[in-house]
Amino acid sequence: DYHHGVRVL
């Protein structure tokens, strides 16, 4: 998923 523009699941 996206978290602060970083791909994290």
Curated annotation (Swiss-Prot):
Transmembrane segments: none annotated. GO terms for biological process: defense response to bacterium; killing of cells of another organism. Keywords: Antibiotic, Antimicrobial, Bacteriocin. Major component of a prophage tail sheath. Antibacterial activity against Gram-negative bacterium E.amylovora. This is Bacteriocin serracin-P 43 kDa subunit. It comes from Serratia plymuthica. The lineage of its organism: Bacteria, Pseudomonadati, Pseudomonadota, Gammaproteobacteria, Enterobacterales.
